[in-house]
A protein has these predicted regions:
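...captures the hydrophobic TM-helix bundle architecture rather than a specific catalytic motif
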Residues: 2-195
Length: 195
């Protein structure tokens, strides 16, 4: 019998142990069963957390695609006035940052979160609650990052906040500080994911 965590119980036969109790499989399935309804958002099972990462990463991919579309509309014809200079630079900065830190890195981590326990014939990651915390930290940080577009807190420093463009002469406001704060928060979740 296979559980929803895709753990193959025939792997128990490899180990020279005594016969397992008949109720053990049912008890493990009961323990690892995900909560129902809205409580499912509190699940710590690696399959659910990995799925959340994939869905969230594709949501951020869509947001970055909308930013790229705005930039392409601006560049479609000469002397276009669709985006202002600062807004274009903000779109450029946000597009690169979202694609790198909120799509590419979490997608690779999601594959690891979903496949690693199955490759090791384990029920879950060693620290499943830390993995769930990392997802929620990434989700909250990424959402605040996207919302910074609507409150005018996006810097104009390029994909990785190039130092000449973030100096006081080019970027006098606190936008770069806000970007660094949120990237630090998102990278905190990346460190928690890697543990």
């Amino acid at each position: 019998m296979r559980s929803e965590t895709c753990f193959d119980y025939s792997l128990y036969e490899r180990f020279p142990t005594e016969k397992r109790p008949d109720s053990e499989v049912e008890e493990l399935n009961r323990i690892w069963r995900a909560p129902k309804g809205w409580a499912r958002l509190t699940a710590v099972n690696n399959n659910y957390v990995g799925f959340w990462y994939v869905v969230t990463a594709f949501g951020f991919f869509l947001a970055a695609g909308i930013l790229a579309l705005g930039m392409r509309v601006q560049l479609a014809a000469p002397m276009q006035d669709f985006l202002g200079v600062d807004t274009y630079n903000q779109f450029f900065t946000m597009h690169g940052t979202v694609m790198m830190f909120l799509f590419a890195v979490p997608m690779v981590d999601a594959i690891g979160i979903m496949l690693l326990p199955q490759m090791l014939a384990a029920l879950d990651l060693p620290l499943p609650t830390l993995s769930a915390f990392a997802f929620w930290a990434s989700f909250v940080g990424g959402t605040m990052f996207i919302l910074s577009l609507f409150v005018g807190l996006v810097p104009v420093g390029g994909w990785f906040i190039y130092p000449p463009l973030t100096s006081l002469s080019f970027s006098p406001a606190t936008h770069t500080d806000y970007w660094l704060l949120l990237i630090g928060y998102i990278e905190l979740s990346a460190v928690a994911r890697s543990i």
